[in-house]
Amino acid sequence: VCTRVVYLGTNDRNVTGRSMDWKSEIGTNLWALPRGVNRTGQAGANSAEWTSAYGSVIATGYDISTTDGVNEAGLAVNLLWLAESQYPAETADGPAVSLALWGQYVLDNFATVAEAVQALTATPLRVATAEVPGEGRMATLHLAMSDASGDSAIVEYIDGQQVIHHGRQYQVMTNSPTFDQQLAITEYWKQIGGTVMLPGTNRAADRFVRASFYIDAVPKTDDPLLAAATVFSVVRNASVPYGIATSEEPNISSTRWRTVVDHKALRYFFESALSPNTFWVELRQIDFSPGAPTLRLKLGEGEKTIYAGDASSGFERADPFPFLGVP
């Protein structure tokens, strides 16, 4: 359910792209969240407490969680499904954070991947999950980070323990199996060579292999237009046609939307499967100062609302959405 890639261009033109694959309407809107906001982890006893040090533009899931976004320092997060995720027990140590706030915690507190990894390694979070709205099953996600330097990290919770893969080489993430197994599968396909044959199904392991080959094979540039277009083309290649879903395999679902982050330009692109246009947000045009209003760009049912080009001025004041807490 989703594919994420990082393009390492020339002259630090580093660009992250992802698809959001989900079998039903996910109720996404874009939000601009300022600095200086006090938050808690909303996960019961010992919940983390912090004040946002960085403003961010995010895409929500159901308007109760941060599923994707980038902060004003150029740090991006992408949350993707991972069925194998097992989060710490309620009795485990560490500051507690609801899964809905996990990505926002990173965007609020850190400027770089290295900074986030250092903090999360020193003090692992006790991430707590809840049911997906209307699904009757627990949400299970892993988190990817990337920054303006091209650095990346993948954070997973396996058997209740935090596992972090940190390095520029971790440019691709999809879904099952766990990241270490994805890397092993990709090594096998490297021996065959992508120009000879690539696996073509919608399964997560196949999307991982295709995305890994193409994000490495495409030409590298510092041209912001070409870089963004290139990343969109790779993400589209790993997308799932609209209307395709496999009920017994939630890892295979229709692509609902795609995002691309130009870390150098601080530009956040959004493309809905049900809208004819790609549009973008210029983070440098948004007031993230403490006390600035929370802003929302309404995408409508099925993200069908049509925007084109720079949609930064389309954001409107709104009451902050409530993150889904875990009792």
Predicted feature locations:
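A contiguous strand-loop segment
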Residues: 1-94, 122, 127, 131, ...
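A short, polar/proline- and glycine-enriched secondary-structure boundary/capping micro-motif
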Residues: 25-30, 87-91, 164-168, 279-285
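Acidic/His-rich structured neighborhood in mature extracellular/periplasmic domains
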Residues: 75, 80, 84, 89-100, ...
